[in-house]
């Protein structure tokens, strides 16, 4: 986690009003600019007008962070929902995604594979179990959370 993400996450989290929750903070290059994405959610999903209201709350708060973690050139701010295909980065994200269809990319191969897609059967805080289709049969693959390079929920067609 880079410094901007950690600083913003720690600063913003207590200011997010209930029933909303801070899902993730992302700091990435977008075209020639830097973009700060603040992903918020609530049980049952979040509406676009709610993200607009949260943006109006969050934007002035970011200006009060001291020392200022942002580059002098400025940045773009996006307050959004994590979406249907949401990133899974933290243990609580995986715990909340049990029963959902997910994609997992690993740092190193497990069973000669580096990517898996299937239903997240369980998560115990350290290991996830994914039910994958291997040709014509299902099998459970146990994956240590520390081995996960990238993961997200997927829409199953």
Swiss-Prot record:
User: What is this protein's name?
Assistant: Ribosome maturation factor RimP
- Record the organism: Lactococcus lactis subsp. cremoris (strain SK11)
Keyword Cytoplasm in the entry? The reply is yes
Q: Name one GO biological process term.
A: ribosomal small subunit assembly
Q: Does the keyword Cytoplasm apply?
A: yes
What does the UniProt keyword field contain? Answer: Cytoplasm, Ribosome biogenesis
Purpose of the protein: Required for maturation of 30S ribosomal subunits.
One Pfam family matching this protein: DUF150_C
Report the domain of life of the source organism. Answer: Bacteria
Xref: InterPro entries? Ribosome_maturation_RimP, RimP_C, RimP_C_sf, RimP_N, RimP_N_sf
PANTHER family listed in its UniProt record: RIBOSOME MATURATION FACTOR RIMP
Which subcellular locations apply to this protein? Answer: Cytoplasm
In the record, the note on similarity to other proteins reads: Belongs to the RimP family.
The record's principal subcellular location, in a coarse class, is cytoplasm
Gene Ontology CC terms: cytosol
């Amino acid at each position: 986690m880079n410094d901007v993400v950690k600083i913003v996450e720690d600063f913003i989290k207590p200011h997010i009003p209930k029933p909303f929750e801070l899902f993730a903070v992302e700091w990435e290059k977008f075209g020639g600019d830097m973009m700060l994405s603040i992903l918020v959610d609530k049980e049952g999903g979040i509406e676009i007008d709610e993200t607009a209201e949260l943006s109006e709350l969050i934007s002035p708060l970011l200006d009060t962070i001291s020392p200022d973690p942002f580059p002098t050139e400025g940045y773009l701010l996006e307050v959004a929902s994590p979406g249907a295909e949401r990133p899974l980065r933290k243990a609580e994200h995986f715990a909340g995604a049990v029963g959902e269809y997910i994609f997992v990319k690993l740092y190193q191969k497990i069973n000669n594979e580096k990517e898996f897609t299937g239903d997240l059967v369980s998560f115990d805080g350290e290991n996830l179990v994914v039910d994958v289709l291997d040709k014509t049969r299902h099998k459970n693959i146990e994956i240590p959370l520390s081995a996960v390079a990238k993961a997200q929920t997927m829409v199953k067609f």
